Every structure is written in structure tokens, then in C-alpha cells.
Amino acid sequence: MEWASGKPGRGRQGQPVPWELRLGLLLSVLAATLAQVPSLDVPGCSRGSCYPATGDLLVGRADRLTASSTCGLHSPQPYCIVSHLQDEKKCFLCDSRRPFSARDNPNSHRIQNVVTSFAPQRRTAWWQSENGVPMVTIQLDLEAEFHFTHLIMTFKTFRPAAMLVERSADFGRTWRVYRYFSYDCGADFPGIPLAPPRRWDDVVCESRYSEIEPSTEGEVIYRVLDPAIPIPDPYSSRIQNLLKITNLRVNLTRLHTLGDNLLDPRREIREKYYYALYELVIRGNCFCYGHASQCAPAPGAPAHAEGMVHGACICKHNTRGLNCEQCQDFYQDLPWHPAEDGHTHACRKCECNGHSHSCHFDMAVYLASGNVSGGVCDGCQHNTAGRHCELCRPFFYRDPTKDMRDPAACRPCDCDPMGSQDGGRCDSHDDPVLGLVSGQCRCKEHVVGTRCQQCRDGFFGLSASNPRGCQRCQCNSRGTVPGGTPCDSSSGTCFCKRLVTGDGCDRCLPGHWGLSHDLLGCRPCDCDVGGALDPQCDEATGQCPCRPHMIGRRCEQVQPGYFRPFLDHLTWEAEGAHGQVLEVVERLVTNRETPSWTGVGFVRLREGQEVEFLVTSLPRAMDYDLLLRWEPQVPEQWAELELVVQRPGPVSAHSPCGHVLPRDDRIQGMLHPNTRVLVFPRPVCLEPGLSYKLKLKLTGTGGRAHPETPYSGSGILIDSLVLQPHVLMLEMFSGGDAAALERRTTFERYRCHEEGLMPSKTPLSEACVPLLISASSLVYNGALPCQCDPQGSLSSECNPHGGQCRCKPGVVGRRCDACATGYYGFGPAGCQACQCSPDGALSALCEGTSGQCLCRTGAFGLRCDHCQRGQWGFPNCRPCVCNGRADECDAHTGACLGCRDYTGGEHCERCIAGFHGDPRLPYGGQCRPCPCPEGPGSQRHFATSCHRDGYSQQIVCHCRAGYTGLRCEACAPGHFGDPSKPGGRCQLCECSGNIDPTDPGACDPHTGQCLRCLHHTEGPHCGHCKPGFHGQAARQSCHRCTCNLLGTDPQRCPSTDLCHCDPSTGQCPCLPHVQGLSCDRCAPNFWNFTSGRGCQPCACHPSRARGPTCNEFTGQCHCHAGFGGRTCSECQELHWGDPGLQCRACDCDPRGIDKPQCHRSTGHCSCRPGVSGVRCDQCARGFSGVFPACHPCHACFGDWDRVVQDLAARTRRLEQWAQELQQTGVLGAFESSFLNLQGKLGMVQAIVAARNTSAASTAKLVEATEGLRHEIGKTTERLTQLEAELTDVQDENFNANHALSGLERDGLALNLTLRQLDQHLDILKHSNFLGAYDSIRHAHSQSTEAERRANASTFAIPSPVSNSADTRRRAEVLMGAQRENFNRQHLANQQALGRLSTHTHTLSLTGVNELVCGAPGDAPCATSPCGGAGCRDEDGQPRCGGLGCSGAAATADLALGRARHTQAELQRALVEGGGILSRVSETRRQAEEAQQRAQAALDKANASRGQVEQANQELRELIQNVKDFLSQEGADPDSIEMVATRVLDISIPASPEQIQRLASEIAERVRSLADVDTILAHTMGDVRRAEQLLQDAQRARSRAEGERQKAETVQAALEEAQRAQGAAQGAIRGAVVDTKNTEQTLQQVQERMAGTEQSLNSASERARQLHALLEALKLKRAGNSLAASTAEETAGSAQSRAREAEKQLREQVGDQYQTVRALAERKAEGVLAAQARAEQLRDEARGLLQAAQDKLQRLQELEGTYEENERELEVKAAQLDGLEARMRSVLQAINLQVQIYNTCQ
């Protein structure tokens, strides 16, 4: 606020208004400034607080002013005066018994006389207390609360020596002190703080109004609010309480006297001392809390007193009360609050919508409303309620069509009291959030309706006594009809769904279950007709009663561990039947076909033979259909059979089969051609618990294989006899209901009975499965147990359909309880395959327990698969050939095993190593030990083998590695030891491969110490690199340490040629914070690598920099916007200040600065010489002219300026000394002397203080006194002498200053020279010559140091006070020494700069340019063919190198071009490979299409065959039906005639010619299937070639990728030479892998071809069987022979085709491989050349970089480094050639092994 801060405000007319007046306007405190400030118009009360005018509160209230003591109040009282002594009369009489009257009673001095009056002789009246009374009280009692601002008391006598002012705001009940006044505050009011007050409410004691002067008309003034103290909140309650008063009291506590009353107690003396007060002014105003601008007389106060400040406020802002301290009656919506400036805090009217005229304020309501409204209306009318009468009373509601202020806004509710809540109460108003609708009745829980007059749906019986209104319908909701009321609203009767019953609709009808919300209420039980015992189910769960081991709600599922038997479950195998001389034909099962038989195989039944089946364990008495499974021997074979059922006894008439006649047990059957199952014409009735014998007899058979070849007859093959229950006779099919008829129709339509015809089960229609399950449950009374054999099955559970268990390998049977044909050894692991050798065994079957195969002559073993001991060459076994020195040989190769007598070889035909001789000779061929020098087994045998020389007949030893000599008796070069001693041997010298193995002196022959280490190694084993080298000595890879001198520790790297790095890794010893193998770069977040002392931290500001990194050369951090400086901790460029607070732009005159950046902390501009000023915009001291043309002043200015500056300095020092003397006294520099004198004076005092003073003490005192006087004299003389010396020193100092002025001018000139040199250094600093830069920097540091010393010498000022007389001499010596040193340093700097300039001019780039660009570069760029440094082409790009230039740049460009060319070649090879891959894919696609066409032809033939068979079957069934019809007894002639007519009407859909032609086409198609072999053989060849081409393309692509990587390596020029060797080794490994892949592919091709051949042969065999023109089958032996010959032919054909495919594949693979290999070799040669060139470039680049860092001194060493690298590359090339030769030998060996494998040689 302005008045609190001391800022002047302005009034209405704009005049300056002091803060006192503003405070008066705000707080009614105008008295303090009333005398100084004229009255202003007080603003109205409409915009804020308003206050009444301020005046004297005593006016009109004289009767309310009292005093505790008044003179002459009871009788006249004399008094005297002490002032106006010139007057004759000194004593007077006081008579205050009557009021004062100037004419009648002028001696009355009552307290009412102090009220201000403006009479001309107002000093004639005053108040006076009684004589000598010190404690007097003056008190004003006001009729109301007032604001009190200040008081003024004017005394006629002395002002009181002590007094205090008090106030009361509660009409005198409590008092508080305003201020204490006292001449002696400590004595009168102890503990009260002294004035001035620090805070506006401090109670202090003030002394300035209690002085004894003046003796009359002295004033005491007190202001409540001190204008010098700021007030934070003028509207605070503490300020208001401080100003508010109802009573004011002044306590006078002590009189001022002249002191005579203390010595003379007479009454006359006391008559002079009393209190007399001319005037008392108490300023204030009516206290209205800012709610009134005027006041009226209070009750009982005079109404027309002129100038009276009345006490009753004329309230505004809707307030009332004497002080406006309350709100008006109907304005209680807000809490009462004093008005404030800018806020009236007016009381707000209550909102009662016209329904009330009174209200009250409720603070709780106000707080709950968020301090918005607190008024509560009282006595709401018109049926309203609420705080604002805004609601309707209970049982009334708000009419939405009328305004709330309408008296008829609330209407009575219209609700049925029986069905509504609260006796008919409705919603009083609308509220969408709460769901209230005005006038809406609130019904009971079970009542609805606009008036709540009816029951809710589902309830009935409306009653007023029911708290919920209605009763709930006792109906089950699930069984009740939906969509309406569930019961009658009056009676409660329930409405049930169609399938629901019960009083409450809570039960299902019989045969139904699951009461639910469905449309019908319940669901049918739908129990399975066969799996359930009863059609009724559980009403709650729907569970039907199941037969044994049937589960599911409907009993339609089989329990786990049980199964539903197939219709052919009752099967009896022919192999287990009885008969005379029955021949069992076993049949092997292949993995590629589904068996068409059951059991082991078949029984051959010849004409006239009989087989007997024993039938037991039947499940049910019923009719069973008889099925006979058989297999014809020729395609058109037929047979006639007779089946006789032999019962155990006569059939009882009461049994289920009582209707059976004896002739019914003899049944004739006919086996038709091309059928596999015979269904006998009629079923037989059998009963459980009985044993039946069914005898089957073959009565006749016939057929032919060719029209010209009659059938010779070989019987038929019988598989099994099946008793299939005739399920159609079951009640589920034969019942007369609609469900039974539908089940029968479905069973017949989908031919569900065909499940039991064939052993192989095809998927049935989904409609058959539930019917078969039900029928099976009826026949077998539920499900049957699996009974899986625990040894032969994988699980105890079986297939629920049919009961087939999961068998282990080689195990068959439903229960997995027997070995399959061709397997043996039934046990926990299943059965093992016989695996009889087809070459050595007579049959593929073996004995079922032991697995022994039936061997041919000469074969041996369990599987007849090898020769006997001493023979080989299975199956053509022959004796072993071992020269009598072995008993066994290899069964396949014939190589002898376990040769004796030191022999070896395949036939024991040679001696083993270490022996010699010829064991093939019958005599004298023994193997003898080699004498090298002793034989094997001794400790001195050092040869691998030996032989006898044919010419000299001497034994020649083949020494082991490390030995030499005729008998291997000496150590070879590179080895050491003494083999001549027993146990001695030669050992390889452990030299880590770093010696010449052919050098005899490479190592010591006795100790093995290495003597001639190679490859920069040393040590006793050449196992360490020499000092200055690093690497792995064992790998011959010691390289010279390449350390950057700038980043390397100089103690570990004194020179470039001798740097001690880590011998293993080559890591150089880096300076602090330097990284890199060569110490050539700073660590992250460090910079200044070129300092030679390590790198410095970036120290980037953590928040003002973008990151911790900086420029590695300049150290500049990457700053955020708005920040600058090296570390981003300063303001940005051309700014200054604290970046954390504010940055300001540099305000510098660009004409007067030497750099644009000002001082970053102070903003001072950096002025050029001769310029000064804050902005560098004026001439400096010592310069004249008009800026910017500033010129140095005359030379005399410097002398006079020095004198002036010296005088100014002396003046400042003298001023400082004066301040020190003022603070510390006169001691100063003579403090020690004064302390000495003080000590002696102390001794004198001690002597004087002594009681017993002796003569000696007195003499000692006199002596001390004389000593003191002498010391004082000497000190005075010393001071005089020092003052004279000081004058001399000042004179000499002036002369020295004059000399220093000249020296300063010289220093300025030197600074100018140094700046010029600094500019030259900046120019040289941007060059790339580090050595020159270091020298210049060193010189610059020396120059800087010299400048610093010169400046120190120039500006040093000696102190004349602290130094003695020799200061001048030392100053002259110091200046002389500095001048000589400066001259010497300056001369040295000039000489160094001269040398540096000369050296800089001699530096040439021609050598470097020639090495890099190929030309010296001394010619102009326009004529230079190779360019160079600074040359650019037409496009502005740097030009270096070109055609005919042999520099490093040209060489690198050439290598880059070659690499790109290589990359293009590789890309082209990849494109070609992609083409090959596409052709391979096309070939494979064509092969697959051919195979698909062949398969389609085969499928079509099979389909045609199936159609023919189906037609035949239908024809046979038709004939059989006709026969059955004709044989029936009830057939009448008309029916027979009708059937005959229909039979005759049947027409064949084709003529005999069409049938013949169709048969010919089928035969032709079948014959054409023979070409499938050729087609697929060619196709397989194409596939193999395609796969081989694909593999070749993939290998070529992989190698191309390898070459591409190598090309990228060359292009980058960063890989090592060893990568070439690694790539070559990888190529060799790739070739080996490719060869192995080729071998595996060949094997896979052969396997696939063999499988395809077998499949085609099988297809051809089946086609020949189907062909009508095939030859008839021969006898079994002839058939077996034919099959064997056919197999041999097939094997031979397959072998020939394999050889042909192998030949073609080898030719193609060989050609492709040679092509790829040649291409890879060419690419490898190019890559090796490019790598060698890249290695050369890298070494040259390293040499150039190192030469530049070492001041171009190592250019001579590049040639040596190049030659060394050339030699190393030659070694690597030789190693690579050796690896390539090794690769070729490995490939040859692999090819040889492949050939051997393919030819089986």
C-alpha cells in the first residue's frame, strides 16, 4: 500500500496527499496531520470504507471530564508562581467553588476550563490541582466507542516530571497504557523500554515532554500511530483495538520542583508546586467501522453543541447500531465485517423468495456454502421451507408452471396413501441428478402407478398395512410365462409355461428336466435309447440312468477305459479254426499300406476242405449276420460255400431261438469275383452261454486268368468269420413309433451296417455314430473293458470306438497282446523286427520267441547276415588271405585282423613301424627290429621306420623329428639333448617359434637356451618382445610401439624410437585422462590433448550445457540457448552477468574496444589503449582529442600525473592513519614504548600505594621517575629524527615515481608489441604444425611471464611508513634488476621469434604433398597435374592425386575403384545365382506337375475301378433280392410278373461295343501307367540336378557374400593382413562342408530314387493285376521265383540309373564347382592384392601422422616400415599358398572317398 511504503498519494483534485491524511481517510486518524494538511472531501461510502470527520472529543463533553484534584473546590486556596518573577505579585487565590466566569469568578480553575475555546483571552482560564499533590488523574468518559488519534496538553506550569496515558474500550472495566512520560524513565517506570518505539504498538517511555523547561506553556503531544513506523495492515483487528476507546485517562505521577521543598517542608514552599493546564485537546472521530461518514448525537447528548463530535453513527451499507457494529434485521446473508478501502463489506439482504420478512445469520451455513451465503429465512409462508424458502413443505410439491415467488407455487400432493410412502408424500421439486420429479409420488417397494394405486408385476394384494404395499407372487420365475405378470394381481394364481407344472410353476412335466428361463420352461430328457436304462431323468440335473460303463448326461458316451465294440467285434480268425491239413499263409504288413486282413494272415481252403469255427461267449440272444472275409487268388475267381451251424442240443421252444428250424442251420453261399466279403443270405439265431460249431466247406471254385488259359484251381484264402449282430431287429429300430422309424431310415440311408464289413475302418457319417453307440449298448449291455495288455500297450485306455489299444512298436491285436508278423520277442519293450537278411535268409519271417531267421547255406547269425569266422564277403563267403599270420579278417573288406609277428597291412604282408623284412616270403621273411641306434622297446630308438637299401644292403633309418645321423644318434638343428646316454633324448628348443630351425646355432645344443632370436623377440625362450615392441612373441607378432608423444608419459617414452608400451597389448603409458592404444586422444568429457600434460576435464555446467562433452581442441562445451563461456557457466557471447539471475547485453562502443566480449562478471568493456569509460566511449586519462580520435598527451603529463597521484595516495594514507588514531588512540607505531612507560608507571603506583614506604623505595621511585623522563626525551628525539627521514624518503620516492613513469611508458609499448606477437601466434596456431605451435606457445608463455613481471615492477609502490630508510636503495636495486632482466628477456624473445619465423619460412609441404598427392606441390595449382594442399577443382572440391600420380591419395582411389568393381562383379554373380535359382525352381515345379499328372491318372483309374465294383455289387444285390423275393412263399403270380417285367426293363447304359471300347481304353490307360517309371526317373534326375544347382548357387552366393565382405574390408582400409589368412581358412572349411553336403545330398538322392522306384513298381504291379490281359498267376513257388527275378531286375535297373545319375551329377557338380572355385580364386587374388595395398596405405598413413607429430622428423623411416610390411606380406602370401595346396589335397582325398563310396569299391 502506498501510505505504508511512504509513497505520497493524491487527492481528488490531484494534489499530493501525505500518508497521514490517507491513514486518516482509511482509519479515521486525521488528527495527527490536521494542523499541516488542509481538509479534503471524504469520498462517499459506495466504493469502500467511509469515516466521519475528526474533531475534538472534549467539545460538548465538559461534563464527562473529571479530575481527581482541583484547587479551591471546597474553599479558597492560596498558591504562588515561580515564573514571571518580574511581576510584583507572586501569590494568588484559587476559588473553584463556582464555575469560571471572566467577569464574576475569574479565580475558578475547574477541569472544564481545559476544553478548547477560541475566546480572545483564553489564557485567563485554566485547570489547576491542589498544592503539593503529585498523584492527579484526569479522565474523559465517552458515551460510545470513538476513534482516538492524538492528544495535546498545554501546561501553565512546569510539565509533569512523570505521567502516563491510559485507555479503556469497555467503558472503564479494563485499562491499557498508551505511553509513559518521565524525566527519569528508569527511576519512575523501571523496566519500560525507552523511546522511540520500533513497532506501532510498542509501549515505551518518552523523556522529551518531561523537561523542566519551558516553565510555562509547555506541551505534551501523543500520537497513537507514529507516522515514522510503517503499518502493514491498517484494517487489522489490532489496529482497530488500538484506536478504539470509550474512556481516556491521564495519570500525573510526579511534580517538577526546584529542590527547595526537600530542605524546607513549610506550606508556603508547597504553594509553588502544583499542576496547571491551559488546554487539553483529545482528537478523534465517531467509531463506525467504516460504515458511516456522519454521526448524530447519542441518546442523552446535547444535540446542538457547536463543533461537537457526536457518537451515534448514521450507518450505511445496511448496518445498524451505535457504532454500526451489526447488520440490519433482513440483511443477514453475509457476516458483519468492518469496511475496507475498496470494499464496503456491506450487509446483504436475505433471499426468501417473498415468503418471509425476517432472517438470521448462521455461521455453519455460511461455511458450508463456501463463504457465499449464511442467511437463514425465518417463518416461511405459503407452504414453503428451506433457508431461502425455496422448497415446498412435506406433502406439497413445486408447480413447475409457476415462479417460486408466486404464493401458489407449492401445491398439495395427490398420492394413494395405501400404496405410497410416508402416507402420501411426493417429490417436492425436480432434480435430474437425484431422480426427483416434482409432484411424483414415491410408491412403496411393490407398488406402481402415477398415484401408487396398483401392484407391481409379480405382486398382488395392495394393502395399507403392508410396508411394501403388495405381496410377491409365489411363482417360480423360470416356470412362469414371460412378458407379463406371473400371477393374478388379486388372487395370486401363477401362469405356468407349457412344459411346467405345479402350483408355483416350479416342477417339470414327466420326461423333462432343467427348469429354466427357456421359452418352454423345461427341456426333454432325451436319454440315449441304448445307453440309458430308462427314458426318465433326474429333474434337476437331467442325468439319465446309464447302462454299465456308459457316462454323460444322456448316457451317450463311453467311460474311459472302456469301448464301444464295432459291429464285427465277434470275429473268429481262420488261423485259429480246426481242420485237416490247413495251410496258414502269413502276410507281412508294410508301413505304406493298410492291411485288408486280420490276424496273422490267411488259411488256404481247397475244394472239398472243411474248416470248423468254435463260437462261444455271445453277448445276447438274437439273430447274427454271418460274414466271411476272404481273398481271391485270381482276379475273376468264384467259389461256392456251405455253412452248417451245429448246436449243442435241440432248441427249446421257449427260448429266444425257438422259431429256428433244422434246415435254417444249413446255409449256402456264393463267392463272387472282385469281392472280399461274403454276407450269407440269412442270419442265424444264437443264444448266449452256449457253444456252437460253425463248419465251413468249400464245395466248388473256379475262374480264369486269361481267356485262353483255363483256371487250374488252387483254392481260396479265408481270413476270418464274423458274427455281426442283426441290429435292425432291436427295439430301437423295430419299434412302431416315429423315432424308431426315423432311426431305421437313417441307419439304412447312411449304410451304417458297412462298419463291420472290412477290417480297415473308414470314417463313418456323423449320423451313424450315435446309432451304433446305442445299438452296441443294447447288444452288449453297456461298454466293454479295454483290457489293454500292460506289456504291449502304451496306455491302459483304448479307442472308445472299437477298443483298439495303442500298441508298442511291432505289437498288434486289439489288446496289443501279440507280435506282428515279422516281429518277435513280445515283452515290456514291445516286439523287435526280425530283420532277416534278404541275401542270407530263406524268408523274411523269424521264430517268434528267439527271432532266429531260417538261413541259407553258408550264411550265419541270428539274421543270417554274415559269414562264419575265418571267412568274408557275405553273401559270397570265402576264406581270409593273411599269409598265415592272422586267423580272422574283416567281414566286408577281407582285411586281416590281429596280425602277428610284427606284421601289418590288409593281408599281414608288411612289417610294422620299427621293424624290417618281408613277411610274404615263406622262409626268412621274419620282421626284425630297426637298429636306430637300438631296436623298438628300448630307450634309444629314435626312428619311425627303416628299410634295407637294395644297392648297399645297409639299413637306412627314417629318423623321428629332432633326430639326425645315420642311426639317428644326434640331435637335429633346433633341438637339444644327448641321445647317446641311456634315457637321453632330443627335445625341441622352446624358442616360441622365433628362431631359424635350420640354423645350427639358433639355440644351445646342450641346454636348449635360445641364442638367435628373430622377429624382435628376446629372452631365454624368445618369449618376450624387445623393449619398444609389443605383441605375442609365440605368434611372431611383435610390432614396434607407436605412441603419440603428446599423450604419452615422457618418463616412459623419452623418444619416438624408444617407447615402452605394454608388451602384450601395445598400450602406451598415457598421461592423465588420455586414451587410445597410442595415447592419441582424450578420454570422454576431457580436452586439450596438445598440452603435453594430459587432458583437462571439460567441467561443463550440468544444467546449462547440452551434455558433459566438449570440443577436444578448444574445450568449448555445447551450451543451451542463452548460455556461453567455455563451460557454459557464463552468459552467452556478447553478454554479461550471473546466468542464474539475469544476463545483460554488452553495451560497448565498437569504436573503442579491442574485443567485442565485455567482462562476463562486471560487464566492463575491454577498451583499447587510450580509451576508457564504462562503454569505452571516451578518451582515457593521459589522452586528448575527441573520441574515437584519442591521442596521447604531452610527455609532461605523465610526470605531473604521477605527482598528483602520489599526493592523492599520501592523502588517502594520512586519512587512514587519522582513522586508526581515532580508533586506537595515540599509540600507533610507538605502542611498544608506551607499553613500557605504562609498566614503569604501574611500578610507581605500586610504590606509592605501599603503606610502609622506605628510603630505598623512595630512591627507587626517584630513579624510575628520572628514567621515565629520559625515555620520554629519547622518544621525542626519535620522533623528530623519523619525521626528517620521512621527508627525505618522500622526496626520493617522488624521484623514483618519475623514473617509474618512464618505465611504465616503456611497458605500454612492450604490451603493444606483445599483442602484435599474440596476433602472429594466433595465425600460426591455426596451422597443423604441432611442433611449431608448441614452440610458439612456449615463447608466448615466456613473454606473458615477462609482461607480468614488468607490470609488477612498474606498478609496485613501496610503503614509506612500514619500511625504513633503506627502502629507496632496495627499490633502486629492484628496479635495476628488473630492467636488466626485462631487457634480457625481451632480447631473448625477439631472437626466439626471429628463429621461429625463419624456421617457419623454411618449412615446406613438398615432401608431404609428394607422398600424399604424388607431386611436390611447388607448382601452381592450375599447372600442377596432381594438385596438393590448397588446390581445388572446378567444383570447389579439394584436388589431390589423379591419373599418373602415385601418391597415397591416388593409390587409395585406385583401391577404392577396384573394391567397387569387385563389388559390382559380386553383385552380377548374385544376379546370375538368382537366375540359376529361378531355373531350379521352375524345373522342380515341372517335376511336381508331372508327378501330379501321373498321380491323377492313377487316381482316375482307381476311381473307375471303384465305380465298376460298386455297379457289380449293386447288380449282385439286385439279383439276390430278386431271388429272395421269388423264394418267398407268399409271392403271388402278379408280383412275380411285375418284378420280371421291371428286370427286363433294366437297360445297360452302354452297348457291348461301347463296353469293349471302354475296356480297351482302360487297358490302354493302365498300360500307359508303365511310362510313369520313365517319367518319374527323368523327373527325379531333373530334381536331383535342380537341387544340386540350388546348392551350388547357395554356396556361390555364400562365397560371394564372403568376397563382398572382403571388398568392404578393402574399401574401409581398416582390417589387418591376418584377415586374408582367416578368409582362406574359412574358404577351405567351406569347401570341406560343401563336399560333405554334396555327399549327403547324393545319399539322399539315392534313397529317394530307391523309394520312388519301389513305389512305381508297386503301382505297376497293382496295374498289372487290374489289367484284364495279364497272365494268370502260377503256383506259389513259381510266383515267388517271378517276384525274386522281378526284384533283381528292379535292383539292377535302379543301380544302372543310379550310376547314370551319379555320372551326370558328378559331371555337372564338377563343372559348377570348378567354375565357382576359379571365380573364388580370382576374387581371392584380387582381394589379397587389394588387402596388401590397403595394408601399405595404412602403414604409410600411420607414418605420415607420426611424422607430423614429431615435427616431420620421421619421414626417413617410412621406407624401412614399407619394406618390413612387404616382407611380412610375402610371408603371409607363402602361408596362404601352403593353405591353398593343403585345401586342394583335402579336396582330392574327399573326391576319392566319394568315388569309392559311389562305386562300392
UniProtKB/Swiss-Prot annotation:
Subcellular location(s) of the protein: Secreted, Extracellular space, Extracellular matrix, Basement membrane
Coiled-coil annotated residue ranges, if any: 1259-1306, 1475-1529, 1576-1793
Region (Disordered): 1684-1703
Glycosylation sites: N251, N371, N1088, N1252, N1311, N1351, N1502
Physiological role: Binding to cells via a high affinity receptor, laminin is thought to mediate the attachment, migration and organization of cells into tissues during embryonic development by interacting with other extracellular matrix components.
Distribution of this protein across tissues and organs: Found in the basement membranes (major component). S-laminin is concentrated in the synaptic cleft of the neuromuscular junction.
Single Gene Ontology BP annotation: cell morphogenesis
Disulfide pairings: C286-C295, C288-C313, C315-C324, C327-C347, C350-C359, C352-C377, C380-C389, C392-C410, C413-C426, C415-C441, C443-C452, C455-C470, C473-C487, C475-C494, C496-C505, C508-C522, C525-C537, C527-C544, C546-C555, C786-C798, C788-C805, C807-C816, C819-C831, C834-C846, C836-C853, C855-C864, C867-C877, C880-C889, C882-C896, C899-C908, C911-C927, C930-C946, C932-C957, C959-C968, C971-C986, C989-C1003, C991-C1010, C1013-C1022, C1025-C1038, C1041-C1061, C1043-C1068, C1070-C1079, C1082-C1095, C1098-C1110, C1100-C1117, C1119-C1128, C1131-C1143, C1146-C1158, C1148-C1165, C1167-C1176, C1179-C1190
SMART domains, alphabetized: EGF, EGF_Lam, LamNT
Region described as Domain II: spans on this chain: 1193-1412
Subunit text: Laminin is a complex glycoprotein, consisting of three different polypeptide chains (alpha, beta, gamma), which are bound to each other by disulfide bonds into a cross-shaped molecule comprising one long and three short arms with globules at each end. Beta-2 is a subunit of laminin-3 (laminin-121 or S-laminin), laminin-4 (laminin-221 or S-merosin), laminin-7 (laminin-321 or KS-laminin), laminin-9 (laminin-421), laminin-11 (laminin-521), laminin-14 (laminin-423) and laminin-15 (laminin-523).
Domain Laminin EGF-like: 286-349, 350-412, 413-472, 473-524, 525-555, 786-833, 834-879, 880-929, 930-988, 989-1040, 1041-1097, 1098-1145, 1146-1192
Keywords, in A-Z order: Basement membrane, Cell adhesion, Coiled coil, Disulfide bond, Extracellular matrix, Glycoprotein, Laminin EGF-like domain, Phosphoprotein, Repeat, Secreted, Signal
The protein's name in its UniProt record: Laminin subunit beta-2
Record remark: domains: The alpha-helical domains I and II are thought to interact with other laminin chains to form a coiled coil structure. Domains VI and IV are globular.
SUPFAM superfamilies xref list: EGF/Laminin
GO CC list: basement membrane; laminin complex; laminin-3 complex; neuromuscular junction; synapse; synaptic cleft
Main location: secreted
Record field: transmembrane: none
Listed Low complexity bias regions: 1684-1694
Occurrences of domain Laminin IV type B (ranges): 564-780
Signal peptide, first to last residue: 1-35
One Gene Ontology MF term: integrin binding
Ranges where the Laminin N-terminal domain occurs: 46-285
Region (Domain I): 1446-1801
Encoding gene, per UniProt annotation: Lamb2
